[in-house]
């Protein structure tokens, strides 16, 4: 038994200067777990609710004192005396206590912070690393892998104040033999890209996720700049480095007109036309993964996209699936996409997150563990990626300590596990292995 004696919630700051919830869980014997909830900018409409205070006189309405009060009040009372090793039971207690479909009473930010803190406290009580405890909870004890990183080196959309409509342009160091080598390759391309952008007279200011946020003539111009940067860094595009995109297409979808409006380059597309636009990019560049290539509700369009490209590249559902097993099952049953992005604050507990990962893997989908644009120094997703052998991780660029914290944790884990956690590179990407 690792009984909970105290649960503490507090309001802390995230990487965008907005409040978020941090929770501490204290166990008998002095064991402690602490975790913070992240926050998204481009959010799916079906995500679990992030509870904000709405008091415009305080943090412009974005305070989280209501969520913190839920942690310090009803959640703390309900969990006191319970065994922290019983993760699923404790998560269910919080879900039932909240009593809403989308965790609107307490907020997914409150429930998730406690859920993750429980797991960390339990790992502490077991005297094992968090990734090892997560593997136990996942039913795969001792099974690990180092994730292939998707490094977001050009930011657009809701993550930057620029003319680029597509939200993320990412590189994947598929030619590396280890995570450490892959991280180095990514960093070298990132610095090479800074020189390319400067030489063309572009800004090298960074967006929410640490990537550069230049004003470019088109979305394809971002891919062209990265292509030059990869070559200048001494790598071969398509062999050493592959490309990935997160369109976050819901953000530029005009629901009334039923069109995809790339305002930055003055182009408009129907659903089918946008699929062909994306297909064209994959033919000109080694893009092996596209996330949220259409609006979250455009299921007919996604069916077409999957038929068009699903046997060649990875099609990732983020806003589409929101880490929700009910929605994911519908996608699996209807042949929609072939991969899922996992963001634990979209669903609100570690147990539900693990269930989504299992369902995806059982269906032959690939899994990408992801940060949010509003992050903290909390590096739990690094342990989640290794402990579930997810295979891929998205945690931003090679700048901003809120992003680099996750990479540094992965370096530590790889050092500790060595050959027990293989780095499989391109084999992890759907359609490429």
From Swiss-Prot:
UniProt record, GO biological process: glycolytic process
Per the record, the pathway is: Carbohydrate degradation; glycolysis; pyruvate from D-glyceraldehyde 3-phosphate: step 4/5
For this protein, the record's InterPro entries field holds: Enolase, Enolase-like_C_sf, Enolase-like_N, Enolase_C, Enolase_CS, Enolase_N
A single Gene Ontology MF term assigned here is: phosphopyruvate hydratase activity
Amino acids binding Mg(2+): 246, 291, 318
The source's domain of life comes to: Bacteria
Cite a GO CC annotation.
Answer: cell surface
Main site of residence? Answer: cytoplasm
Query: What are the UniProt keywords, alphabetically?
Result: Cytoplasm, Glycolysis, Lyase, Magnesium, Metal-binding, Secreted
- Record-annotated disulphide pairs: none
Catalyzed reactions:
(2R)-2-phosphoglycerate = phosphoenolpyruvate + H2O
Q: How is the cofactor bound?
A: Binds a second Mg(2+) ion via substrate during catalysis.
Gene3D superfamilies membership: Enolase-like C-terminal domain, Enolase-like, N-terminal domain
Give the enzyme's EC designation.
Answer: 4.2.1.11
Instruction: Locate the residues binding (2R)-2-phosphoglycerate.
Output: 167, 343, 372-373, 394
Active site annotation, chain numbering: 209 (proton donor), 343 (proton acceptor)
Which Pfam families does this entry report, sorted A to Z?
Enolase_C (PF00113), Enolase_N (PF03952)
Q: Which cofactor does it need?
A: Mg(2+)
Protein task:
Catalyzes the reversible conversion of 2-phosphoglycerate (2-PG) into phosphoenolpyruvate (PEP). It is essential for the degradation of carbohydrates via glycolysis.
Subunit-level organization: Component of the RNA degradosome, a multiprotein complex involved in RNA processing and mRNA degradation.
Q: Which family does it belong to?
A: Belongs to the enolase family.
- PANTHER family hit by this protein: ENOLASE
Tell me what this protein is called: Enolase
Which organism is this protein's natural source? Shewanella frigidimarina (strain NCIMB 400)
